[in-house]
A protein has these predicted regions:
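N-terminal secretory signal peptides that target proteins for export/translocation
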Residues: 1-10
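Bacterial N-terminal signal peptides
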Residues: 12-25
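N-terminal helix-cap/turn-to-beta initiation motif at the start of protein domains
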Residues: 31-42, 82, 135-138
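Short beta-strand segments that buttress and anchor functional surface loops
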Residues: 45-48, 88-95, 104, 114-119
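Central antiparallel beta-sheet cores of small beta-barrel/beta-sandwich binding domains
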Residues: 53-109
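Hydrophobic/aromatic beta-strand elements that line small-molecule binding cavities or substrate pockets
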Residues: 100-107, 115-116, 128-133
């Protein structure tokens, strides 16, 4: 009987202190999703495709414009596959238009490597490009 009482007191003490211990434990701050893209310099960027496709310029306002280069419309759902200090990988689906998987690796705040593959309309795409800031948006 003494053991039952001791266990009950111990359990009450443990569960009484457990929530307090959680409050005192150091909290790990969560970085905002895709925060690497927030570090990229805003402005006009030039995309140089490795397959010889003509260069293309885009105005980078948030960095997220690089995710859906073949699907620039809104209304697409996105799923973050990987999100690290200098690499993001996002899978996206655009109902009625297709889908893609894009990987963006930061070399500097004005230079990134982009790899994307998927389906745009009824056509498959797969490209690798270097994106570099070239000035202010026009």
């Amino acid at each position: 009987m003494a053991k039952k009482g001791t266990s009950a007191v111990w359990l009450r003490g443990f569960f009484g202190l457990f929530p307090a211990a959680l409050l005192l434990a150091p909290a790990t701050a969560q970085a905002p999703a895709l925060s690497m893209l927030d570090h990229l310099q805003r402005g006009e960027w030039e995309l140089r495709f490795r397959d010889g496709t003509p260069t293309r310029k885009i105005c980078l306002r948030t960095g997220r414009e690089l995710i859906q280069l073949r699907h620039p419309q809104s209304g697409c759902s996105q799923y973050i596959v990987e999100d690290t200090r200098n690499l993001v990988k996002v899978q996206y689906t655009c109902p009625g238009s297709g889908y893609g998987l894009t990987s963006i690796r930061e070399e500097t705040s004005s230079l990134v490597q982009v790899q994307s593959a998927g389906l745009a309309g009824s056509r498959a795409f797969d490209f690798t490009a270097e994106a570099r800031r070239v000035g202010d948006c026009r």
